[in-house]
Amino acid sequence: MGLTPMMRQYMEIKENYKDCILFFRLGDFYEMFFDDAKIAAAELELVLTARECGLKEKAPMCGIPYHAAKSYIGRMVNKGYKIAICEQLEDPAQSKGIVKRGIIKVITPGTYMDSYFLDENENNYIMCLYINNNEGSNCALCFADISTGEFNCTDTPFNLSVILDEICKFNPREIIIQEDIDSNILQGIVEVFNETFSRVDECYFQKGEEVLREQFKDLNLREYTPEIIKCGGALVKYIKHTQKTNLSHINKFQYYNIVDYLTIDINSKRNLEIVESLRESKKKGSLLGVIDKTNTSMGGRQLRKWIEQPLIDRNKIMERLDSVEEILNNICYHEDLKEALKNIYDIERLAGKISSKSVNAKELNSLKSSIEKIPDIKVILSNFETSLLKNMYKNLDELKDIYMLLDKAILDNPSVSLKEGNLIKEGYDSEIDRLKEAKVKGKDWIASLESSERELTKIKSLKIGYNKVFGYYIEVTKSNLNLVPEHRYIRKQTLSNAERYITPELKEMEDKILGAEEKLIYLEYNAFVEVRDKVEKEVTRIQNSARIISEVDCLTSLARAALENNYCKPEITLSDRVYIEEGRHPVVENMLSTGEFVSNDTDIDTGENQLLLITGPNMAGKSTYMRQVALVTIMAQIGSFVPAKSASISICDKIFTRIGASDDLASGKSTFMVEMWEVSNILKNATNKSLILLDEVGRGTSTYDGLSIAWSVIEYICRESKLRCKTLFATHYHELTKLEGKIKGVKNYCVSVKEVENNIVFLRKIIRGGADQSYGIEVAKLAGLPEEVLKRAREILNSLETEKTEESMEGTNLPKKKKEEKTSSQGEQLKFLDIEKENLINEIRDIDILNMTPMEGFNKLYDIIKKVKSI
């Protein structure tokens, strides 16, 4: 037995789309077969059935109505699946044999354009990564959002950390990679990003110049590296392959240099809760959640980009700050802008729908009503004097011609469907007007006929109706059948309580009305397409106006946040000093009642105040303080006012954090190993213009090991000539406070604590000097540990504090509980340990530390620590 002709057609199409769920159109349904059916039935909670396919066993099958496909497709795509839409390409009634079918679109997580399933305040990026294995290790990354037309490219010498940081910045839903990508590189990406990966053949990376020139007119490819051309070309090819159409709104090839923006690595972005909270992964509880007061979807997405890519160009930062200040100082214009922006729809994504020819008449009206507000925005902008706002006023296109076209052509309340008519206004097309009049007159004639037939037949309940199957009919209830004029009425349909008839004159008018309606629908559709195509030719103008509006919205949002939260305008300096007077954590402050947050000063540079060594108990506020310094810096560099009484910020190129501890069990890495890798990454990649936050370095191992590592890291940061960057270093190792005065740049600070009736009160104030004790047991008491545990902890602490601080851990004798006896084997164990210790000491003595890199040093240290733990 062989496959049936229809199933053979299915298998031939499926062969070319193996990585997709194939939605195969059969009549009014999309059907799925075999493994696709099993997957879809499970994911969409559909009934799994079977169908004869010509084989011994039936083919598993499930299906969905084609008119409800949108919601099912959205659910599958959001789960990471790709959907290939296979349509009937000819009328089944007219075809001979198997209906011709073909793929009209492939919908993937990175190419989905349905606004119902997209987050309006977040871009839906698809990314392509290309690594050149032949010429060194250069690579290129390209990111596109086909819902808005955005297309960004960059290149860099290969560095997995840099690649991961860029991916994290754009957060793509789908990543296109080479078929032969190095498995270790892929594993490194997969460990961090659990997104859809699409492997493509090498042919996608060929003829990139030709592909890019066709998509981006007047693009000078000589400005770009071969890696960018291959990467960008592959991404355009993939988009065209899946969308099966040219997308004119993807028209701006935007190159950016990674070093033109403040780099915030993955760990820092997460620890600082920049765009989402650490606990719930939501906007609320993040920096973005505090300062996002935007009124449009476009503005929300733009502000997110600003936060992901803070500036390092002082002039650009000052342009934004000056604009925010001017908006803030003109409260009336501020409110007027807010009101005008509130009524603007998502112009960027509407332009994308126009370009992809998926826009409907109601959405064109949304564009029209948005354009209607642009003159109001332009009038408000004319009142400002700062250079950025003046340029926005100058370049904002009011799009009056597009508004006039849409206002003249599209009905105020049109049909959603383009195949039902009711789209075009009276006066736009004379033939459409004539047919509409004929349609109205025909229906008036029907109403008149109904009235006259009631008169003639004396049947008061007689009525004329219509349905798509039988057309127009005269309906008479069975109780009145004796009054029917059988010589004129022709029976059409019998119902349980009525009969339906037609007459020759009714049939004649039906042909006229339906003919007019069919032609009217056809003409209205064509007129709509004509209008849409005219608007599509102006997509670039629409996008430029949308971009300006989104940036105005961002500046207005930052002004609103500054007003509501009492922020100050920071001074942006070219020095190496950061001075913050009465600084506050923007997110924590936002969660407390007004006035509850305790502000703190910060004075840090690359000279005498290079490394602030912060001691104090847990829960006292060390981490909050360190994070607020980083967040104030980020806010200043996006052009925002900052939570402080005053602030002078030197421009930072990178921010690194080592905060918190967690095992990476999936990769077999302990807390300490993860910590050491992160510290190593910081020391290798930081520059003298970076800001480093280190919290409890060394806590993942034994006390003296951790102390030694922390001490060594401080020395390296302060003494390495290429580093010497601004650093906040929180620690429990009070011994480190001795470094002030011994290592240039180290300054001791602590969190003040007050004891009241044997209880501690955290004052949250950062003051000069080191902490005299850690208050760890008091914190444990606050956490509710049993009194027996606390009592025993105090006994041990008192014993430890009486011993010499120089004494090694091996020689420390912890106090034993009462009635506890020593084991008889301890003496023998100590003799064996002495030999092991001697060997380890000799190994350490032979280490040539001056000829080791930081990473080699950490690896050697890790080996030593493992040996110590085994002794």
Curated annotation (Swiss-Prot):
The keyword Ion transport does not apply. PROSITE patterns: DNA_MISMATCH_REPAIR_2. It comes from Clostridium kluyveri (strain ATCC 8527 / DSM 555 / NBRC 12016 / NCIMB 10680 / K1). GO terms for biological process: mismatch repair. This is DNA mismatch repair protein MutS. This protein is involved in the repair of mismatches in DNA. It is possible that it carries out the mismatch recognition step. This protein has a weak ATPase activity. NCBIfam families: mutS1, PRK05399.1. It comes from the Bacteria. Residues 801-825 are annotated as: Disordered. GO terms for molecular function: ATP binding; ATP-dependent DNA damage sensor activity; damaged DNA binding; mismatched DNA binding. GO terms for cellular component: cytosol. Keywords: ATP-binding, DNA damage, DNA repair, DNA-binding, Nucleotide-binding. Belongs to the DNA mismatch repair MutS family. It holds the Pfam family MutS_III.
